[in-house]
Amino acid sequence: MKYHDGKDRCSWANPKNPIYIDYHDKEWGVPVYDDHKLFEMLILELFQAGLSWECVLNKREAFREAFDDFDVYKVSAYDEEKQAQLKENKGIIRNQRKISAAVSNATIFMKIQEQYGTFSEYLWKFTDHKIIHEMGKTSSELSDQVSKDLKKRGMKFVGTTIIYSYLQAVGVVESHEEGCFLYHKE
């Protein structure tokens, strides 16, 4: 699909939303190795469950402010009072179960960092540090494995579909559509 700038993009990239276009062009499918960014995306994907990714992206800056710039240490220490404040924040998705999951997932994220040195090392070990090229899926054997392991560790809102979306977002799985200017063959 041609956009106003003459570039073809993936069909899901809403041409009327510059935030979405920027995300598609500069972030989605780009390999991420930085734990801070990996944590941010994990939290955003958690809040996306049952909603559109575009909705979450439109609220991203409010999430960033509300969640202390996605500082995993600060988020892991959120008490009931801070969680109640988040529940009242109209700039974010105010779902108590998701807010609680973000806090408990932060603690588990740090435990994984302790075990593997970085969360990045943990995540990329599932593919032997290789990018997987596949399109047209909402889950895979890989997302099943990662989801199962994260659930075993106690994380919430990490089902296989959410994890597949996360893997695409952080570039472990590259899924740009054929015809998209960012499409790469294996």
Describe each region flagged by the PLM.
Residues 1-186:
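HhH-family (HhH-GPD) DNA N-glycosylase catalytic core used in base-excision repair
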